[in-house]
């Protein structure tokens, strides 16, 4: 007998005689206090490495490749998206985030990805990015 058949037969049996079934609970034994009781979690001291949960930040320096050379820098969490990074850089450069293209080690950075996808924060504290400013009119 498969698990589905066992469950079906149990439900059929329960629907035929719900009051007499051994798994049924009499309605008078159910009250609102039984339903709304909160069970506190046990207090256990954390045994792991707290450094895993700390926010890791890197210093990002983005510099244009072509003249006129422009530069922007910020301290940012590696769990930030590339779009969030572009928004910070754009505010410093007085431009739109959509006009900024960033590259790291020859690879374009995708807006929806995390900075952590490209940079290892454990081994790097400063990241130098190539920046391209597009003329959007």
From Swiss-Prot:
Residue ranges of domain Ubiquitin-like in the record: 58-135
Keyword set, alphabetical order: Cytoplasm, Nucleus
CDD domains for the chain: Ubl_ubiquitin_like
Claim: Transcription is one of the keywords in the record: no
Subcellular location: Cytoplasm; Nucleus
GO CC annotation: cytosol; nucleus
Domain of life: Eukaryota
Protein name stated in the entry: Uncharacterized ubiquitin-like protein C800.12c
